[in-house]
Structure formats: structure tokens, C-alpha cells
């Protein structure tokens, strides 16, 4: 009977065949231990010399790392294993023998591993990170579908940009200028006027010459836009969404979190409502903590965000930033028009901003004024302005960076490990 490592628990004390790769092996005289993986998980295969043909035991000792195999044997309980079971191997069939696999069990430098990213993905920890990434995506669809959102796919090639063109990748669209999308927001706002609540999930591109552990050139973003929604209601949706995702990972990725040695007690504390602190109060807090490198009207850097988040040890909303450091489309704060109705959600443990969101300007005259103030081409945004001409309503939206969120939940140091094939300032290969 052919099965998988994940399903093998359903076949205790039965003989099964599993297609797998050999990740590592060791032997102690009359017993060989094979570390097997098949994409669904990792399992040990035990080959006892006295219980198999001589050729099988010889093969078990000689087979090379990352060779592909069909392994047949009996599934037995093993309480020492993370899975709780292992295979007593009876026969091995080599599908393809691997030669001189470059990523050996010894330690390798990050650049070497990134050069071999196509192979590094096979390792146990990288496999666990990708499984958590997959669970975040699955839980995202679950949340938005259950809450009545409609998925909309905005274009990747655009003629306009939500936040200006200075950090965009430029290309030619036949005889026109085009840019790789840095956000689907403007298109989602249009879709929200048709469907009420919409979301998207897709790649975004930022031509930022940044080398920090938080930044990728290409990353994936989950964006939501909601008609007839105010700023306070939007924050509630955002915190409910993030809480749902964290709980889903805790429930469905226990083994992966264990492999990554993640301190799950920090994730178990994540619950609504999240703390909120205004930009003004955040500036005062930082001053009280000895930060003298930040003044009102300046954006926060990584050390500032980390200090604020660590104070709460939870995801925290920083609200109502100064108008002059935020994009043109954000609604003024009626209590202080030098600020806007916006919020950044800062993850704890130094992972930084994972969500940026705001209430959108819904008045045509104000939006036209903002477009001019920011030096944007009004013609390029004519469709966006149309949304305010024909039945404008209060509406809000937000965007969550997938890779940063996965890094935080997984506890990995750098976002490069949370994308299958990360695009960094100095890396376009593989």
C-alpha cells in the first residue's frame, strides 16, 4: 500500500510504501537509521541487518544524501519521534541517486545557502517555515470568505501608483510607461464600491535600496477594502484577522513551530483588542525612554517601533500619524487636521510594521487638492477620482505584508527565509 509520511500514522503495524528523499543517515554496526522526507513530513526509517536481505542493508549504508527512493516497511510506534512513529524498513528501491549534494549536514554560511535556495528549501526548518506560510495564506482566505469579503485580483502592471513613483520598477507597456504594482489599493477601492468588502492577495514590488532584515524587493501582500466602514471599525477587522491567523498557526502547525523552536507563549497571548497608542503619545513615550533622535513630524525607525512594541509585548496599533509623512489618500483626523486617520500595526519582538491602513479620503475636492499637493498626474488618477464623483461613501482599507507576518509568527530572524525564492537588493537568483 502506497502512502505518505503524514498519513503513515493511520497504518500502524501495517506494511506500506513511501516515496521519499534521504535527508541524512547514520549507522551503528548492525542498524542503519535513514532520515526520510516526502514533502508531507520527516520520518525515520530503521534498517536492522538481521531482518533484511544483505543487499538491502548494504544499500541503506551506501545510499547518498537526497537520493530519491521507494521505501517499504512496517509502521511502528516510536514515542521518541516528533511524529510518534517510524518505519521498520524491509526493502529499498532507488529511483534516482544523488551525487555530491552541496548542502551537507555541516554548517554553511547564509550566502552559500541563498545561492542554493532551490535546495535549501528541502531542509527541515525551511520546510517548516513554508508550511507556516501556507497556513497563514489558508487562514487568510478562511477569514475573509467567512466575513463576506469578495476576492478581487488587481493588475500587476499599472499606470499610476498609490504612493508616488519614486520606489517603483519602471517598464515599457508598448509605447506607454508602466510600473510594477506596489499595492492594489486603488483598484480595490473601486471594487469595494461594487462589492462592499473586497480583498486581494498578490505580489508587490518596491525599488527600495534597503538591506535590513525586514525588507524584500518583491513581497506578497494581503489587502482589504471596506465600504461604509470607519477607521475604528477597520482596526477591529484588522485585529480580528491577525488573531485568527495566529490561532490557526498555533492549532495547525504545532510540529513546525516545535521544529523552529518558537516560543509559542508569546503567540498565545495574542488576543483582541490590541493596544492602541497615538503617534503623539508614541513620541512622548520614546522621549521618556531616552530616544533623542525623533521629533514630531518624523517617521519611526526600526528601533523606535521595537521599543514601542516591546513595551506592550503584543501587536500594537500606532494611530494618527502626521499628514505630511503619509500618502495623499488618507482621511484627515477631525480632531487634529495635522494628522490623518491611519494606523500601523507593529509586531512585537522587533519584527516591525506588519499592517498599514487608513480611512480613505471620500470627498472629491479634498482628494483633487491632495493629488495636486503631492505633484501627481491628475489624468493618471482620473479613474480614482471618479470613485468620489459617483456615490462616494466612507471607506477604509489596509495591507498586511505576508513575509514579515510569517517571520514574526515563525520566529525566524530574517524575512528572506519566509519567501520561497526571495528577491533582495543583491539577489535575483535563483
Curated annotation (Swiss-Prot):
Keywords: Aminoacyl-tRNA synthetase, ATP-binding, Cytoplasm, Ligase, Nucleotide-binding, Protein biosynthesis
Enzyme class: ligase
Listed CDD domains: AsnRS_cyto_like_N (cd04323), AsxRS_core (cd00776)
Gene Ontology terms: biological process: asparaginyl-tRNA aminoacylation
Single GO MF descriptor: asparagine-tRNA ligase activity
Gene Ontology CC terms, in alphabetical order: cytoplasm
InterPro entries assigned: Aa-tRNA-synt_II, aa-tRNA-synth_II, aa-tRNA-synth_II/BPL/LPL, Asn-tRNA-ligase, Asp/Asn-tRNA-synth_IIb, NA-bd_OB-fold, NA-bd_OB_tRNA
The keyword Cell division is assigned to this record: no
Family: Belongs to the class-II aminoacyl-tRNA synthetase family.
Quaternary structure and interacting proteins, as annotated: Homodimer.
Record protein name field: Asparagine--tRNA ligase
Organism: Staphylococcus aureus (strain MW2)
Amino acid at each position: 500500500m502506497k502512502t505518505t509520511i503524514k498519513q503513515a500514522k493511520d497504518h500502524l503495524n501495517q506494511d506500506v510504501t513511501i516515496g521519499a528523499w534521504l535527508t541524512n543517515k547514520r549507522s551503528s554496526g548492525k542498524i542503519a537509521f535513514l532520515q526520510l522526507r516526502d514533502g508531507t513530513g520527516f520520518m525515520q526509517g530503521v534498517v536492522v541487518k538481521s531482518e533484511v536481505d544483505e543487499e538491502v542493508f548494504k544499500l541503506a549504508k551506501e545510499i547518498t544524501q537526497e537520493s530519491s527512493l521507494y521505501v517499504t516497511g512496517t509502521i511502528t510506534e516510536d514515542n521518541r519521534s516528533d511524529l510518534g512513529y517510524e518505519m521498520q524498513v524491509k526493502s529499498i528501491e532507488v529511483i534516482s541517486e544523488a551525487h555530491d549534494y552541496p548542502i551537507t549536514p555541516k554548517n554553511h554560511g547564509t550566502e552559500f545557502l541563498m545561492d542554493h535556495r532551490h535546495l535549501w528549501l528541502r531542509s527541515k526548518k525551511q520546510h517548516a517555515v513554508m508550511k507556516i506560510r501556507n497556513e497563514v495564506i489558508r487562514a487568510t482566505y478562511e477569514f475573509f470568505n467567512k466575513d463576506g469579503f469578495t476576492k478581487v485580483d488587481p493588475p500587476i502592471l499599472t499606470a499610476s501608483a498609490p504612493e508616488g513613483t519614486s520606489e517603483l520598477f519602471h517598464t515599457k507597456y508598448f509605447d506607454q510607461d508602466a510600473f510594477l504594482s506596489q499595492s492594489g489599493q486603488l483598484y480595490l477601492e473601486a471594487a469595494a464600491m461594487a462589492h462592499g468588502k473586497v480583498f486581494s492577495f498578490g505580489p508587490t514590488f518596491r525599488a527600495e535600496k534597503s538591506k535590513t532584515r525586514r525588507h524584500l524587493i518583491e513581497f506578497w501582500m494581503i489587502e482589504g477594502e471596506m465600504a461604509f466602514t470607519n477607521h475604528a471599525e477597520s482596526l477591529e477587522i484588522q485585529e480580528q484577522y491577525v488573531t485568527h491567523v495566529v490561532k490557526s498557526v498555533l492549532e495547525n502547525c504545532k510540529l513546525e513551530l516545535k521544529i523552529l523552536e518558537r516560543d509559542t507563549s508569546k503567540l498565545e497571548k495574542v488576543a483582541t483588542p490590541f493596544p492602541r497608542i497615538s503617534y503623539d503619545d508614541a513620541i512622548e513615550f520614546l522621549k521618556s525612554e531616552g530616544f533623542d533622535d525623533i521629533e514630531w513630524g518624523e517617521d519611526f525607525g526600526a528601533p523606535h517601533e521595537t521599543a514601542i512594541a516591546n513595551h506592550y509585548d503584543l501587536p500594537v496599533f500606532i494611530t494618527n500619524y502626521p499628514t505630511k509623512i503619509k500618502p495623499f489618500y488618507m482621511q484627515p483626523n477631525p480632531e487634529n487636521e495635522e494628522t490623518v486617520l491611519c494606523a500601523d500595526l507593529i509586531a512585537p519582538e522587533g519584527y516591525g510594521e506588519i499592517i498599514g491602513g487608513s480611512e480613505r479620503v471620500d470627498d472629491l475636492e479634498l482628494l483633487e487638492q491632495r493629488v495636486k499637493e503631492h505633484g501627481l498626474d491628475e489624468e493618471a488618477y482620473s479613474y480614482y477620482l471618479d470613485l468620489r464623483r459617483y456615490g462616494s461613501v466612507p471607506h477604509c482599507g489596509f495591507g498586511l505584508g505576508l513575509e514579515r507576518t510569517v517571520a514574526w509568527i515563525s520566529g525566524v530572524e530574517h524575512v528572506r527565509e519566509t519567501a520561497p525564492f526571495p528577491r533582495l537588493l543583491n539577489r535575483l537568483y535563483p
